[in-house]
Each structure stands twice: as C-alpha cells, then as structure tokens.
From Swiss-Prot:
It comes from the Eukaryota. It comes from Pinus sylvestris (Scotch pine). This is Glutamine synthetase cytosolic isozyme. Irreversibly inhibited by the herbicide L-phosphinothricin (PPT). Homooctamer. Residues 20-100 form the GS beta-grasp domain. One of its GO terms (cellular component) is cytoplasm.
Length: 357
C-alpha cells in the first residue's frame, strides 16, 4: 500500500469536522454473511437511541424481492471503530420490513423477546462464547500454513503451540484481540486450536443479548482484518475431513440461581431440561454440525445427549470447580462455529428458565 494511501486512511478528522462516521452492520440472507455500509453523522453519539434508522437493498442480500426491495436497519448496539478510531463507531443493527415486522433472517428480534421476559431478566443470564474459526489461504481455500494439496504433521503439537512450524496466523489473531478490546467488546482470551490454522477467541462473560451483539461485532472485526491480510475466514464446523478437529462455539452459561449457594442442583435441573429438548437444540445449533458431532475429536455424538464433570466428550460439560463449590456454570459443547448466537443464547435461556416439561 502506498504511503499516501496509508496517510489518508490514518487522517485525524477531529481538527477539521465534528462529523462522525458510523459503520452500520447487519447479517445477510445466508444467516452468516455480514454486510455493512457507512454514513456520516453530524456529531458524536452517546446512545444507540440517538442513531437514525437506515435502509438497504434487500434484493441484493437475499432478503427481499426486487419489486419491493427496501429493508430497514434498526441500530441496536454501538462499539468503537478500531479501523477509523477517533469518535467513529461500529453499529450492530437488525433488519425489518417497512411495516415494522422483523424479516425472517432477523433472529435478534425473537431473542430480545425472550431476554425481556421478567423471569429471564431477573436471572441475569451470563454467557461466555468460545468462537473457533479457521484461517484459509485465499486462492486455494486450504488452511493457513498447510502445504497446498498436502497435510501437516498429525494433531498434537498445535494446541496453544508456539513456533513457526506450529502456529500460523498469530498476527491476525493478536490484531483482532486488540481491536476487540479497543471496540469495547468483552473479549476474554485467545488460543491456538488443536487443528493447525484453527484458532479461538472468547467473548464474555456478558449479560443477556449483549453477548450475541458482541460476538457478531467480533466476527465482523475479524472479517475486516482477514480481508486486509488477504486471508479467508471460515466458520465451517468441519473444514477438513478426516482425523482433524472440527470448529465449535462452546457456550458457557449461568443464571443468578446457579451462581448462588446450592446452584449445582439448579444446574442439574437445567441440564435435564436440555436433555429433553436435545433434538430441538441440535437442529438450531448450526448448519453442517453433523459433520462435527461424531463422538470423536472432543465431541459427543449428535444423536445422544450426555453430560459429565470435566468431560470434553460430553454434550454438556460441568467444570470441576463448579462441582467442588456447589455453584457456578456449565458449558454446552454442541453449538457449531457457524451458529447464530442470538438463537443459541436465547434458546438456552428459554429452555432452562421458561420451558415447562
């Protein structure tokens, strides 16, 4: 990139204008593709309520017909923009038809209804989302660092590995980590995964629907960073067939009752509810998850529900600290890396708090 272009991209506008750039972000028709466009605001904003609604051509995103293509964006969450910096912002939006009804691909609206239920809000649901992903070489769609058409050595040395022959893509990972912290996303950590070229970042603990807003924004930031790096970001739950780990989005969850004394009994009752609705959850936990949930590579078989303490081959894992202290949280290990966090987080809350067997 030329120095002139770099200088222009890094221009500090604060001395010449009060205007602020807002990048409006939404989810496209596939349910995983992220879209965005920017607009100028007259000045800084302190609340999402100050932001105007906007619209876009839904016929170009698979979300509307050409003869009636306008879809309306409702701003829902604000984050600092790590690319433009200054007072510029990223805005997570959801999408509605002109008559005010949520379009079918808008999963946030239904999630918000669940999280706004008094029984749910009173429980102050906490989520920690472990987003696994794979970095691919742009032109061949093969994992970063792998020989083209070939394979690296067997799994073993790559998980949390260090070294040029074990960890590929660390600059991207660290850039993303810092960008999320700058943005105000509650990112809590990163690590290299079992399959080389695969990494993980964690968001949370965050309360209610904010966990999903933060994960979608973190995904957007990663998409932008990999775009800049010339690398393809994949959320495929099983990007490479064979003796290689898949990619999930393990979802850690607790309620106020679970975090109190005697909470372990509440956890066990919640897990029993999840068992009774196992099929419904599996069907909503990500496309292609059957390629990942095979009972191998630290997964449970998708057709069987199981849970255990410290068991990473179970559907639901309870940590040893939770068992020892008699309170805490549990981890739902079933969601795939391409899951929609609005669906998964709200469904877990609905099943464990609202649903009556």
């Amino acid at each position: 990139m030329s120095s002139v272009l770099t200088d222009l991209l890094n221009l500090d506008l604060s001395d010449v204008t009060e205007k602020v750039i807002a990048e409006y972000i939404w989810i496209g028709g596939s349910g995983m593709d992220m879209r965005s466009k920017a607009r100028s605001l007259s000045g800084p904003v302190s609340s999402v309520k100050e932001l105007p609604k906007w619209n876009y051509d839904g016929s170009s995103t698979g979300q509307a017909q050409g003869h009636d293509s306008e879809v309306i964006l409702y701003p829902q969450a604000i984050f600092r923009d790590p690319f433009r910096r200054g007072k510029h912002i990223l805005v997570i939006c959801d999408a509605y038809s002109p008559n005010g009804t949520a379009i079918p691909s808008n999963k946030r609206a239904a999630a918000a209804k669940i999280f706004n239920e008094k029984a749910v809000s009173d429980e102050e649901t906490w989520y920690g989302l472990e987003q696994e992903y794979t970095l691919l070489q742009k032109d061949v769609k093969w994992p970063l660092g792998w020989p083209i058409g070939g394979y690296p050595g067997p799994q073993g040395p790559y998980y949390c590995g260090v070294g040029a022959d074990k960890a590929w893509g660390r600059d991207i990972v660290d850039a993303h980590y810092k960008a999320c912290l700058y943005s105000g996303i509650n990112i809590s950590g990163i690590n290299g995964e079992v399959m080389p070229g695969q990494w993980e970042f964690q968001v949370g603990p965050s309360v209610g629907i904010s966990a999903a807003d933060e994960l979608w924004c973190a995904r957007f930031i990663m998409e932008r960073i990999t775009e800049k790096a010339g690398v393809v970001l994949s959320f495929d739950p099983k990007p490479i067939e064979g003796d290689w780990n898949g990619a999930g989005c393990h979802t850690n969850y607790s309620t106020k009752s679970m975090r109190k004394e005697g909470g372990f009994e509440v956890i066990k009752k919640a897990i029993e509810k999840l068992k009774l609705r196992h099929k419904e959850h599996i069907s909503a936990y990500g496309e292609g998850n059957e390629r990942r949930l095979t009972g191998r590579h630290e997964t449970a078989d998708m057709n069987t529900f199981s849970w255990g303490v410290a068991n990473r081959g179970a559907s639901v894992r309870v940590g040893r600290d939770t068992e020892k202290e008699g309170k805490g949280y549990f981890e739902d290990r079933r969601p795939a890396s391409n899951m929609d966090p609005y669906i998964v987080t709200s469904m877990i809350a609905e099943t464990t708090i609202l649903w009556k067997p």
